[in-house]
Structure formats: C-alpha cells, structure tokens
Amino acid sequence: MNKTNDPVDSVAHREPQAVVKAYSENSIWRNRDQFAVGHAEIVELLTKKWEKEKDYRLRKELFCWHDEKIAVQFWYEYRDALDGMKWKRCYGLEDWTFDVDGRMRKRQMSGNDVELKDGDRWFVEGKSVEEVEIGDKHW
C-alpha cells in the first residue's frame, strides 16, 4: 500500500464515506482549528470542508517517516465557496499515525491559505499536479 498517495486518491473522489474506510473507528483528526473523533465526526468535517472548497486539486509529497508515523507536505488549490469563489492555495503539513492493521488512527493538519491572483494557479486543468515544478520558495 502506498500510504502517501492512497489518501490523495480517495480524497480526489470527495466521498467522505469512502475516505473514512482508511481510518480506524476512533481515529482522531485535527484539520486546522477543527477537531473530530471517529467516523461520523470525520464524515461531517469532510462534508463541510468540501462544501467550501470547490474545484479542489491536491499534491502531497513524503516529508519523513519513522515506524508507524508519516509526515507529508502538501499544496492544494481550490475555489472558496464562502469567499466569492476566489482561488486559493493551501500550503501545509500533515502527520499521520497508523494502527497495526494499516488504518490511520491519528491525522493532524496544519495549513495556511494564500489568495491567488489571475495567472498564479499551478494546478490547472489538463496538467497533472505531479508535472508542476514547485520552486524552493514554496518548499
């Protein structure tokens, strides 16, 4: 199993019920300033998140790992449905802790949004997010 890309793939479909299958029943989440414990709360958190974040394009890179823990760096772009559909990019880090069965038991995300001007988008239609050169300034 590719633990870095599997969550990316399930998120791309934006189906909270499918996403939570990768998490333990009592998984603990922090997503920015929101906290969730267990599948029902995670589904609620994801539903609200994706009501806000439209046309979501995500890229994650392995940052480091040790035993049952992984950290990833990510960038994603979206249109903010709660802010006039402005394009934004989120820069952030996540740390994940896995159970012995391979499901994630803890996920913590810290991210910062930057409003994008015309022409600033990286993850445009017709181009894979993996093709985008992300310069040192953004690493």
Regions found by a protein language model. Give the residues of each.
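Eukaryote-specific detector of the first structured module of a protein
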Residues: M1, V11-R14
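A short gly/proline-enriched turn/hairpin at secondary-structure junctions
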Residues: N26-V37, K49-K54
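Generic alpha-helical secondary-structure signal
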Residues: K3, A22, E41-L45
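Short, well-ordered alpha-helical segments enriched in acidic and aromatic residues
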Residues: H13-N26, R30
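Amphipathic alpha-helical repeat scaffolds
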Residues: N5-D9
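A beta-strand edge to alpha-helix "cap/lid" segment located at domain peripheries
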Residues: E44-W139
